[in-house]
From Swiss-Prot:
Domain of life: Bacteria
Entry similarity comment: Belongs to the UPF0145 family.
Protein name as catalogued: UPF0145 protein BamMC406_5002
Species in which this protein is naturally found: Burkholderia ambifaria (strain MC40-6)
Pfam families to which the protein is assigned, alphabetical: YbjQ_1
Record-linked InterPro entries: UPF0145_dom_sf (IPR035439), UPF0145_YbjQ-like (IPR002765)
Length: 122
């Protein structure tokens, strides 16, 4: 069964995997790399609040929240990029981050955009 005609609407977070194939599906076509990049900076207020949290130790919730938001935004941008390529799944998804300046961090989410078909009986 060929379900490429619905490829754009079928790409959901459930069809993204860090594995090299999507369980219950066969990769019919590789479309290239899909990526989403976000560059975030800390505010002065946020940096001050985080500095206060370090005095007491433990999880620095202000930075945790900032990182979670950046990862989600990068993931969403990767999905949008894959949809433009006509993908209905993403395999080999990864995150990476780099500090590109004082208080400025780049977060990238990338993977291989693919078209998959459901295996018989899956």
């Amino acid at each position: 069964m060929n379900d490429f005609s619905r490829s754009i609407s079928d790409l959901t977070p459930e069809r993204v995997t860090t594995a090299f194939d999507l369980a219950g599906h066969t990769t019919a076509r590789s479309l290239g790399v899909a990526q989403g990049i976000v560059v975030r900076s800390r505010s002065i207020v946020g940096s001050f609040g985080a500095a206060l949290q370090t005095i007491f130790g433990g999880n620095i919730t202000l930075y945790t929240s900032l990182c979670e938001k950046a990862r989600q935004q990068a993931f969403d941008k990767m999905l949008a990029d894959a949809r433009k390529l006509g993908a209905n799944a993403i395999v080999a998804m990864r995150y990476d981050s780099t500090e590109i300046g004082s208080g400025i961090t780049e977060v990238i989410c990338y993977g291989t955009a693919v078209q998959v078909t459901r295996n018989a009986g899956a």
